[in-house]
């Protein structure tokens, strides 16, 4: 195996501050910091996206031991609304520095930073792995554009990767349909930063802010897109025989919000459905702790970080079987799995948890402990180290073979 430490380059379109872009920025941040803590020399090349209106602060200094290099996009609007990242200077930087790394790890598909990196690394003879994290197969938003990108300039990114990381069997299945050979797929789950959950709030501040007292609280936390199934959740909530219950739909609105609001009004739920917007940091943890149950009725969800974080906050969850979330919850316990697109089943599962609140809270706490053992950052990064070493050993063997 390759000796440690390694010089590892991570290329990701969005990083630490880009909560509005979903789970990948947070996962990449957790992963790179954990690798740095384990003694590796970790560099991140990323862009300056943050949200629809603002950019991340530029920095070229270490972040928790990680050397983060941000490259400004030509247009923040194009990056946010079309996921078209145009980082000034990144391509030249990659051409100049690719050969200085032992291995690289690229995050997300259908983006220019990844294509630039794959091209430069291949030219430099440096192996790389790719973590699509659910982005390999175009399933929502600009599907035709993503397919065209994948068939043209993006095609080589997966094709020339030494390994493709699947975070669940569900994602491995997606990759298989795209022609990625099973032998090229490494099954490694997403990491959680367990240190973030050392002190869990009691949820009192979140409830006080909403003015809901001790009323039953159902929470959805995530991006508002059609794929997340929030419409099914609203219908399921309307079927609950709990007129005092409240539904909190928290997350960055990527276009589905107006439809959710209209549905709530049509069901006479507008006074019981609250949309506080994107929650980050401690506010997110307070919301997860305040909830009696977290519902995540998404489809094509290859992992699902939110249900896992709910368990770490001691809150039971309901997820759908059409996703990697179901794999996670079946491994940890602490929640129920229901058929996707079935509001009645979702409603019954939420009611079951609300009726047996103490039992499910105890199960959620136990599941959170299991989650730490299975998905803790050090555990997952140990698996990544083994993957990197295997790739480098194969790469060295290939270079020794006669032409």
Regions found by a protein language model. Give the residues of each.
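Aromatic "clamp/platform" in nucleotide-sugar-dependent glycosyltransferases that forms part
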Residues: 299
């Amino acid at each position: 195996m390759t000796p440690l430490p390694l010089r590892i380059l991570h290329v990701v379109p969005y990083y630490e501050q880009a909560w509005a872009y979903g789970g990948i920025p947070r996962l990449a941040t957790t992963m790179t910091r954990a690798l740095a803590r384990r003694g590796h020399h970790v560099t991140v090349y990323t862009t300056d996206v943050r949200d629809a209106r603002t950019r991340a602060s530029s920095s070229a200094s270490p972040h928790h031991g990680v050397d983060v290099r941000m490259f400004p996009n030509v247009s923040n609007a194009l990056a946010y609304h079309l996921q078209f990242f145009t980082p000034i200077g990144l391509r030249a930087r990659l051409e100049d520095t690719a050969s200085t790394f032992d291995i690289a790890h690229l995050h997300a598909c259908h983006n220019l930073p990844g294509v630039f990196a794959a091209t430069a690394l291949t030219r430099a003879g440096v192996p790389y792995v790719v973590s699509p994290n659910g982005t390999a197969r175009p399933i929502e938003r600009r599907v035709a554009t993503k397919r065209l990108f994948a068939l043209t300039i993006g095609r080589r990114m997966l094709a020339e990767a030494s390994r493709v990381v699947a975070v669940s069997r569900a994602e491995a299945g997606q990759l298989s349909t795209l022609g990625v050979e099973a032998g090229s797929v490494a099954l490694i789950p997403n990491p959680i930063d367990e240190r973030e959950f050392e002190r869990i709030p009691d949820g009192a501040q979140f409830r006080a802010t909403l003015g809901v007292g001790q009323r039953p609280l159902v929470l959805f936390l995530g991006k508002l897109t059609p794929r997340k199934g929030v419409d099914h959740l609203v219908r399921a909530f309307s079927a609950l025989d709990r007129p005092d219950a409240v539904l909190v739909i928290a997350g960055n609105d990527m276009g589905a919000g107006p439809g959710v609001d209209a549905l709530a009004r049509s069901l006479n739920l507008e006074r019981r459905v609250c949309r506080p917007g994107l929650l980050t940091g401690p506010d997110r943890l307070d919301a997860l702790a305040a909830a009696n149950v977290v519902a995540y009725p998404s489809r094509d969800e290859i992992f699902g970080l939110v249900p896992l974080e709910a368990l770490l906050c001691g809150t039971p969850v309901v997820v759908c079987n059409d996703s990697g979330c179901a794999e996670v919850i079946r491994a940890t316990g602490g929640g129920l799995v229901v058929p996707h697109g079935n509001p009645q089943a979702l409603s019954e599962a939420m009611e079951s948890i609300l009726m047996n609140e103490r039992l499910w809270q105890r199960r959620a706490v136990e599941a959170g402990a299991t989650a730490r053992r299975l998905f803790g950052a050090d555990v997952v990064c140990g698996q990544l180290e083994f993957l990197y070493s295997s790739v480098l050993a194969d790469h060295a063997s290939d270079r020794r073979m006669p032409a």
